[in-house]
Amino acid sequence: MEELIKAPNSNFIIMSNQPYQTTSPEIVEDYIIKRGQPFVLTGTTQGWSRSNMFTLDFLSERYSEMELINSPRNNETHTDLQGWRMKDFISYLQVSPEERNPKHLYGKDIACPREWQEYLSHKLQPQYSYKSRFDLVSHLPDYLQPETLLVYIGSNGTYTPGHIDMCGSLSQNLMVSSDQDAFAWWFIVPTEYKDEALKFWGDKGGDVYNESRFIRPIDLLGAPFPIYVFKQRPGDFIFVPPDSVHQVVNCGPGISTKVAWNSISLKSLPISYFSSLPHTRRMAKPELFRIKAIAYYTLRKIMGDVENTNFNTIDVNDVIDIIAPLLEIFHNILQTESILIPKPNYPYCNGETIPFLQPFKYFNGDRIQDRRCDHCNSDIFNRCYHCETCKTDDGQGKDFCFDCVSSGIGCEFHFKVMVLKEFISHSKLKKELSSFYEIYKNLLAHSGRRPKEVDDIITKSTDRVSDECGFLTTATVAYHVVFYSSQKKIKCHRCEKRFKKFSIIFCTNCNARFCEQCVVNTFGQNFQVLMKRNEWECFCCKGLCDCSNCTSNSNSSNHPRILNNNQQLGLPYNNNNNSNNNNNNNINNNNNNNNNNINNNNNNMNNNNSINNNNNNNNNNNINNNNINNNNHHNNNGNNNLNSSYSSLNALSSLSQQQSYGSYDNYNNNNNNNNYNNNNNNNGHIQILKSGRQYDDEQSSSSGSGSSNSTPTKPRPRNGGDDGLMSHFSGNNNNNNNHHNNNNNNNNNHHMMSHHHHNNNNNNNNNNNPTTSSLSSLSTSLSSSSTSTQKPMDVHSKKRPIVLDNDKPKGRPPKNLKEWTSTHKFIISLIELFRSSNNAILGKPNPHYKPIENLPPLVQLYLSQRKAFGGVLWAKTNSCPLLPCIWVKDLSVIPPNTKLLPSLIQGKKIVVLFFGDQDQEEYVGIVGKKSIFSFDEVNQTLLLKCGEVPLAQLEDLFNTTEPEIAMKKDIAAFNYKNQIEEKEEGLYVKQELYNNKKII
């Protein structure tokens, strides 16, 4: 060893050492805590009168019958021998080394004799003594205190492999006796090189958490980190820093005896809690030291002493330095175990209402904080999930910590029904924390700090805890996971595989969803960190997603998406306006300018853009009815023309897919009229058409007469299709004029795509402005017109209109109130139109909406087997008060293994297929006829409770085809008597119905 230490470029460093008698505890603490380096006190046993007590003769005389637990260890086979007593091991050591068999048995982890413990406590300084007041373990209840005072008896060649002491504890090792020329070599890696040491031992086939490999000194010489070495002899007292990898080998011809113990100090506790515990939990090693309980009981002890102490008799600043880290750790513990359910939306919850927390159950028994997680063996401080069905060896149920449950780990048989349990009321602990903060605040004030400075210290401390625990605490995530475990699987945006919802995070910007596998394996992000955040911008929004949809959208991102200003489009302003406010995609009754956003649709079209940057950037859009090519020519021509030969609604359906408009001249004289007046019921049928994709409205409007250049930006898709709507109103005349009257006067607007300019004066204004229609314009026009604010146009209808004036519902809000989404608005528009137009047709087939393979499975099924269904309706479910669904009349469209109910034969219930991201088995629902709503019966409260995904799929259906609307009178008279047969297992669909039928 001496040669290795002196070798050129050697990474071996002799440990710092000083005499025991002249070295203060502060120096030792500075080395092992602040520097993370080992330290040695020499001559510790010098002058001890009873040094002869630490001999094999003493052990043979007093403790010969003492049973050795898992000792001695055979260093050759790496196994612990069983059934040995002290006299057996001493007899083995008295045999000459050449004759010993096995060759190397190491007496490790032997319980320390009581006499030795008492003598050491008497002789050593309190800062070093086992379970003294400086050892925080002593503050725990007796039943929680671990016994770490152990004896090690070794001969030449025995060793302890490289390892880390558990939970970041401080290791102290004193050689109390040895034969002549017997010693031990220590190899200790500084704390700061912990990760490098873990990798180094791992590369050599070792595991420092399981003491599996001793690396030869010659091999350690080439390690990429410094190694502190020391030759330990009797009286040498070695202090090992927390989280330090170290190994020991006994050398020399004789036998050496060492006494070792571990402790937790005030300065090492933060290292234990924040650094060591996560590693210990990942390795599933039992927490020998209950660090969380240590922090709690130590803080209670100190706070109690402070309350009963006169501040003038103590050094307040020293007490503050002691309390501050303890208070932060205890606050962090309580915050981690707090279940705090925020309002949606956030990355781990996409608009869904998480149910309120039920009261916790209490653990029975007098002992508290004595339970461990049955998966990772980590300490359970106060709260956990508990399976009452599965029993452990002690007859108790299984416990699972919040860290495991938040990762989807729990009882494999009863995960969904695990219950929450606690030892102490969480609210009681929070009150205790508040009282501790008050004491801490008084100490700060007594130290001479100003009130503002005191408040800043408290605020920074609490904010730091909130940041460490995340927007969603670990307990909150675990609560979400258990709740999500009983729900349907959700498809990942990128890989399109289905996962349980607890393995999915949602983009708070575009609602795209990504699974944990894609987040971790493809994009290299920490899923556990992302799901605790309050917002997250996904890889689609950042342009990093490599899925086919995002790639195709990226290829088309060179096309301009949005033209926001009337001057850009060559459209005249409303001359009756004196306001400077411009409104995009909105119909306004306050005399504001109306600007039109035009979206370029890239679905099933070829877009060729020729851009000529001359004087004015006006838009010429030449659309030819003989093909689907959309040619956008940007010239300096002030007049924009539309050449079209479309003369039917079907032609307009194709036209609506091209979504690029300027100012249009219509060369077809067969135009449609609609007299739309609040005082009559003369309404034509209304057709809702929808574009294939939505683009972000990010381009700002230009003002005045200046020209503007539109910068191509990347489109962002939204699941379920686009928000751009176009409606065409047809009536009895041959002019394309829509007459709207707010004050019993007619305002005639010439429309090409049903975009309405409303004026609140009594003059008749004719605006021949060709405009585009968007979802918001249609929805707002419906809500601001008499159809939604006054009595519906169908005088026989008594249904309450859905109000959207302020984009928020009126009246008493539901518990899960959230903002209206574009999909909600689309469905509301359909319902209002259905009510106001005497149940008119709401849609027609649109061949250019989406390829059929991109449609939801239920929409595809409806298109392929339309005759098997009775129409669209709404139904109540256990998980949601309102879900859109399709009434199934022909049971051959459901899986043949679906178990049916007798109430279907009796005519009390019907079979429906629900919209939503569900597995095929979960599509099928059996609902009571009293639990359904016809299409136009829903109200705003129920509609808000419906999720975005099922509504988006319903939106796809209406944009793809003209679906039937289920009528209650038809449902009331219907039953499945002729389609069901009885088998031994129950009722099922007759097998003959599946002949020549497509099964889901």
Curated annotation (Swiss-Prot):
SUPFAM superfamilies: Clavaminate synthase-like. It is found in: Nucleus. Residues 561-647, 660-818 are annotated as: Disordered. Residues 113-280 form the JmjC domain. GO terms for cellular component: nucleus. SMART domains: JmjC (SM00558). Residues 810-818 bind DNA. Keywords: Chromatin regulator, Coiled coil, DNA-binding, Endocytosis, Metal-binding, Nucleus, Phagocytosis, Transcription, Transcription regulation, Transposition, Zinc, Zinc-finger. Coiled coil: none annotated. Residues 574-647, 660-683, 700-710, 732-751, 760-789 have a biased composition (Low complexity). GO terms for molecular function: DNA binding; sequence-specific DNA binding; zinc ion binding. GO terms for biological process: aggregation involved in sorocarp development; chromatin organization; negative regulation of gene expression; phagocytosis; pinocytosis; positive regulation of gene expression; transposition. A zinc finger (PHD-type) spans 489-544. Monomer. Transcriptional regulator involved in phagocytosis and pinocytosis. Both activates and represses transcription. Regulates expression of acaA, carA, pkaC, csaA, cotB and lagC. Promotes amplification of the tRNA gene-associated retrotransposon TRE5-A, a mobile genetic element formerly called as Dictyostelium repetitive element (DRE). Suppresses agnC and agnE encoding argonaute proteins which are part of a RNA interference pathway controlling TRE5-A amplification. This is C-module-binding factor A. The gene is cbfA.
